[in-house]
């Protein structure tokens, strides 16, 4: 987890500076203290920001919220809810998909989306 925290913090700092945000201004926009934000950026925070705060950070920086949430070691709240609503089926699906390539996962996602659309058609 230490390397993940450091990598997330490094990426966050690089993107924040590239977008021209000061540490104080960005902390204010994300609703955290500048001290905590500094600890996150240096990989020294005891815990990563919440999934919701990471989503806000990503959106402010023009980054993909899901990718950034994963980079921070968090899980999007909606995904957590989906898993909790289907406590047997969802873990089984994820285990079955383990080891698939990114291309295979994208294709599987498309198949599931098509299946969902079929279920909505009259």
Where are the language model's segments positioned?
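Helix-turn-helix DNA-binding elements, focusing on the entry/boundary residues of the two helices
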Residues: 12, 23, 34, 51-54
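A short, Lys/Arg-rich alpha-helix, primarily the initiator
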Residues: 1-18, 105-106
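Interfacial/linker helices and their anchor residues that mediate assembly or domain coupling
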Residues: 73-122
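Short alpha-helical DNA-recognition segment
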Residues: 20-40, 68-70
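Short C-terminal boundary/hinge segments that cap the last helix of small helical domains
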Residues: 62-78
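The alpha-helix within a helix-turn-helix
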Residues: 16, 27, 58
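DNA major-groove recognition helix of helix-turn-helix
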Residues: 41, 49, 72
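DNA major-groove recognition helix of helix-turn-helix/homeodomain DNA-binding modules
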Residues: 51-67
